């Protein structure tokens, strides 16, 4: 009797499924953007430019090599908007939404993947959470579009409806894509509306709301103002977000935007403190800002939004955990603490790992681009921070970069969006080791 060898079936982890899902959608988006119908001139867009745009949209970044408003047709803009929406919600969440709408049962494996994709604390209630994510997203985007309608319809007529919807989704998903460029004035973002309090406030609010995280919004909608019932994570996110909004606003108001009326200075300062985390819109000339302000924006870009949100970056909780651990070390305490709760040691390790990974990608990418393009390192650091944190702000060099440098930015955007732990666990597995080696002390500092 002939015995055939048995082949062990390879089971993909949840983290590998998330990465594969993003990569597949990214490639399909690039192929659609290459079609002649996607460009206003009905030309075939080079693959590397289509892939760059698709990655930027799916990873809700906003860096572009072609002006979105003047280069892409309505079809191309629609593809970009769809990619933004998928990227903001997450490929797995969108897939789960279609499964729920079609009446299919969600398997245990699929629930596990959904849990990882949404940064939910447990698998229980994940289907209900997915439904909540879809409802809250639709609510914010539709209300935002309605508030933007008067401004855009006054300037663009009936086309203003499309502009309002596009910019509302782009803002809530922290994407930073805009349609305001023309053949005569490309890559202008929201600079022409810098003095418009309604538009800048609505866009800024959508950016903040999208960056808070869906679990935080679940607490807000469930417990209203009963703050002591919020998850510790939600409290940390709200406090850290407020800290990262107020202090940069004060700095920009006092030291950067010193000309103009008080209202103009407040609007500019507020918006430029919001948009680096991690939207990509701008109402000021970024290249004209002082070097200290640009450095502050790089820091804000790297910190990013909150876990389980539409934003990218290292995340506010990573920053908060590192600060709490540093404070505990100063006080010779064994554990970091928040709001009367002890932080698990694994969270501190993960925070340090994520911060180290983002900083490594940030510096390494800038080094490669600076070498390849012969550009100042400071400009390249700004660009790579924007890419790896999926922000979309630039000092104007993106369209002029060569294919190698564009490839570096594509990789940084993709790696930044799928997340640090997702990458680590997909590559090395998420199962803890069952054996431990002998311990020995090492001097630190």
Locate the predicted segments by residue:
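Membrane-proximal intracellular helices of multi-pass ion channels
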Residues: 1-445
């Amino acid at each position: 009797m002939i015995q055939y060898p048995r082949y062990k079936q390879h089971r993909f982890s949840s983290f590998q499924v998330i990465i594969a899902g993003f990569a597949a959608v990214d490639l399909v988006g690039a192929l659609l953007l290459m079609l002649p119908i996607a460009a206003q001139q009905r030309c075939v867009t080079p693959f590397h430019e289509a892939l760059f745009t698709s990655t930027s949209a799916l990873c809700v970044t906003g860096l572009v090599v072609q002006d979105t408003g003047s280069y892409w047709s309505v079809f191309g803009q629609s593809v970009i908007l769809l990619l933004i929406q998928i990227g903001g919600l997450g490929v797995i969440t969108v897939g789960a939404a279609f499964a729920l709408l079609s009446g299919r049962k969600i398997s245990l494996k699929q629930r596990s993947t959904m849990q990882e994709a949404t940064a939910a604390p447990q698998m229980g209630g994940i289907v209900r959470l997915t439904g909540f994510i879809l409802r809250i997203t639709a609510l914010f985007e539709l209300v935002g579009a309605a508030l933007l309608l008067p401004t855009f319809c006054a300037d663009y007529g009936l086309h203003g409806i499309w502009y309002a919807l596009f910019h509302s989704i782009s803002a809530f998903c922290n994407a930073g894509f805009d349609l305001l460029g023309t053949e005569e004035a490309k890559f202008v973002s929201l600079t022409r509306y810098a003095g418009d309090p309604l538009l800048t406030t609505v866009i800024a609010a959508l950016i903040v709301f999208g960056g808070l995280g869906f679990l935080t919004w679940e607490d807000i909608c469930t417990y209203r103002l009963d703050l002591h019932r919020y998850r510790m994570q939600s409290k940390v996110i709200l406090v850290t977000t407020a800290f990262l909004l107020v202090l940069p606003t004060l700095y920009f108001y006092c030291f950067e935007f010193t000309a103009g009326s008080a209202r103009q200075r407040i609007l500019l300062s507020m918006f430029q403190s919001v948009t680096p985390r991690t939207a990509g819109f701008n109402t000021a000339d970024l290249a004209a800002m002082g070097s200290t302000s640009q450095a502050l924006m790089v820091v804000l870009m790297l910190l990013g939004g909150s876990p389980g949100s539409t934003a990218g970056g290292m995340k506010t909780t990573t920053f908060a955990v590192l600060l709490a651990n540093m404070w505990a070390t100063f006080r010779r305490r064994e554990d970091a603490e928040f709001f009367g709760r002890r932080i698990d040691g694994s969270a501190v390790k993960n925070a340090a790992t994520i911060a180290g990974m983002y900083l490594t990608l940030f510096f390494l990418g800038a080094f490669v681009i600076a070498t390849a393009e012969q550009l100042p390192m400071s400009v390249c650091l700004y660009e790579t921070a924007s890419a790896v944190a999926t922000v979309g702000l630039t000092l104007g060099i993106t369209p002029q970069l060569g294919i190698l440098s564009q490839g570096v930015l594509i990789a940084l955007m993709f790696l930044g969006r799928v997340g640090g732990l997702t990458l680590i666990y997909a590559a090395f597995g998420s199962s803890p080791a069952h054996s431990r080696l002998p311990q020995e002390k090492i001097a630190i500092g």
